[in-house]
Structures are given as structure tokens and as C-alpha cells.
Amino acid sequence: MKTTKILLHTGVLALSLLATQVMAAVSADEAAKLGTSLTPLGAEKAGNADGSIPAWDGGLATNAGSVDSRGFLANPYASEQPLFTITAQNVDQYKDKLTPGQLAMFKRYPDTYKIPVYKTHRSATVPAAVQEAAKRNATTTKLVEGGNGLENFDTANPFPIPQNGLEVIWNHITRYRGGSVRRLVTQATPQVNGSYQLVYFQDAFTFRTNLKDYNPNKPSNVLFYFKQRVTAPSRLAGNVLLVHETLNQVKEPRLAWLYNAGQRRVRRAPQVSYDGPGTAADGLRTSDNFDMYNGAPDRYDWKLEGKKEIYIPYNSYKLDDPKIKYSEIVKAGHINQDLTRYELHRVWHVVATLKPGERHIYAKRDFYIDEDTWQAAEIDHYDGRGTLWRVAEAHAEQYYDKQVPWYAVETLYDLLSGRYLALGMKNEEKQAYDFNYSASESDYTPAALRQEGVR
């Protein structure tokens, strides 16, 4: 794996330092806690007071379970049963460890929504090179452009010891997801009665430093490249989205293009940002809802509320089981909660409030970000009237054979309409994730889109 530094100190980002405030990194003494009292990525290594959250012991080993011929991982916790199940009848006993969004789900679906709580396993880990990069970042990476860009950033997790809410969000945006990956996943947007038609995607995702032809001496503001091809249903098949995700989207907005298979044309797609519509999502998610949250943070003020212990989806191997059919997961109102697993974990709580004069359909977002992975686990979305509107839950899974923490399924529940979106299901696919995907910069150019669309 490449860990060569992205040269943000050159070119336009370097010039920005002359005109904008630079937010400092932590001291060497603080950074020395990484790998001692803190995990290599900055979580508290110790367990909690009553032992319900254990100490981090290094995460799951790469041989924690078998990998079948289709690439699916064996569930290392398959023999475990829930410690208890939270329902609408007993939810008041546990409300101090639930988010407002989770509590709202119990009110919206009192007869079917449940949270099965299992023993906590701090399974997350990343490769040694990523851990080492995080430690370097702690003393070198800085926020620039008012917090909308990074300087001296290496690989992933720029702020393992965050000092404010914006640094926590940058950890989510830049977190390690395998370097270069191709995946086959599905998306469902069920009607209120539970009926749905799946949309099938082939995604490719490569950090710039993981390109085959990466040149460390070539300045660039690109963090990663993303390409998404719709393969079904037929009315959408062949449409392709290409994104160059920039590190400073205020200085240089995200670059996006769409290939429309019907028109056989490639066009720029500035709408693929902020609250622009998500791909084939039937209006149920915004562009920046993808991956729970993505893109430029400049439209919000970010406040770090601190840490708390809550029940979040974790170790979701049962939900990702290849023996499970999509029809067993997608149900009316919400996914089949009998297939889910929740555990007690510490999270960073960050509140994003829309800045005066800015526009977005979400006026406020409450983020709950897992301390061990920097992945958003729960996000509550409020409309302009202050009403809790949408609730996002990410069902995390450690891809232990590759040392990659990521999601099995992302869900986004619309409390007002009674509909939802489930993205990332791959149970019925073959070789759904390829963490050895190799790509060149030319694979992520507008010129490559037409060829991608007609395959």
C-alpha cells in the first residue's frame, strides 16, 4: 500500500495559507498517546467503567474467519445471542443510550422496530501503514481555508486527536476504505407497503495515492476518484457517474460528470453535491447522504458536543450473510431488524447547523461517529422547521481479511413519508467486493465514461 504524502503544500492550497487561518495540529506529547493510552487511530484504548465496552485489543485478526468462494466472510460471532432486545415497550429503560432518531423510529414503528443488543466487540483495525500515517498526521496535518481544506495530509485520518467538530468530520470523510476498491451493490427504495425494485450498481473507488500511475511530484487537490455505473434496471442501465473528490471543495468544487446512456452524452454534473438528488434514490437521499456523509463541509457550523456511549449497528455479518435474500432484508417501514446487531460503543457527537445565508434541505444534522473507525454510525437530519425528518443508520462490518472497516448496509429512514432507502446490500452478488482493484488515472476521466456505459 502506498502512503506517500499528498502534496497539498504545493500549488493553490499553499497559496491559500497566505490569506486564511491555519488550524494547528497537536503537540508531539499529545501524539505520543497514540498506540499507548489511545488506539493507533485515536480511540480510548481502555474499556468503560462497568466493562460493557471492553478495552481495544488490536481488532479482528486477518484470519478471524473463513472467506467463501464468493468472497463473503464467515461471521466470527455467529454463536452469540442478543443480551437483550429493545422494543417500544421497554425503550424508556435504555433511552439514555439511544439517539433521538432511534427513539423516533420506535414511535414511528412501535410494532416492528427493535434493537437487538449483543456483546460489544471492538473488532476494527486497519493496516499498520495506515496507523503510522495517522500518527504522522497528528502533528503535521492542519485545516486551512477556514476548515474546508487540509495541508500536509497523509493517507487517512488527519486528526486522530481531534480538537473540534470539523476535525472529527474530516476523519469520517478521509477514513481508510481499502485504498482502491470495486464493488457490486444494490439499492432499495421501498414504497410504504414494502414493494420495491432494486437498483444495481458497480462502484469503483480509488484514492489518488493508490493509482497505478500515482506521481507524488505532481501537485493535485484530488483526494479520491469515484465511478458508479448502473447495471439494472434496464431503464437506468448504462448511466455512469464520475467524481473527482477534491480536498478543498470551496477552492476547487467537486468535479463530476454523468454519462447518459439514452443520449450517449457526457455532461458536467454540478448537481452531484450538497443536497442535489442521489442517484436513482427516488428523492429519498441527497448527494451528501451517500456514505452517510460526504463532500464539502462549508455550509455548516460544526460543534463538538463530546463523547457518549450509545447502541449502534456493529459487526453486521448476519445482515451481510450470503444465505439471506434481499427480500428477507427489505421490509415495509424499515429493514428486517431481526437480522441486525447493535453493540454499545463510544461515539463522538457532532452537531452541524446550517450557516446563516446558506441553503440546504437539512437545517441541522446530529452526527454520532464511532471512535474506533471514524465512521458515522447514526445521523439525525432536521428540516428548516426544526422537525426531525430523516434518520440514518449505518450497519458496520469489519472486512477482517483486508483490515478494512466499512459498511454492510446504509439506511436512511424518512419519518414523514414512511419510506426509506437501503444501500449497499450485496448478499446475492458474486465477488461483490474487490479490494485488489487496480486503476490508473485514465480510468477516471470523462473520456472513459462512454466506454464504461456501453459495457
Curated annotation (Swiss-Prot):
<protein>
    <recommendedName>
        <fullName>Uncharacterized protein PA3922</fullName>
    </recommendedName>
</protein>
<keyword id="KW-0732">Signal</keyword>
<dbReference type="Pfam" id="PF07044">
    <property type="entry name" value="DUF1329"/>
</dbReference>
<feature type="signal peptide">
    <location>
        <begin position="1"/>
        <end position="24"/>
    </location>
</feature>
<dbReference type="InterPro" id="IPR010752">
    <property type="entry name" value="DUF1329"/>
</dbReference>
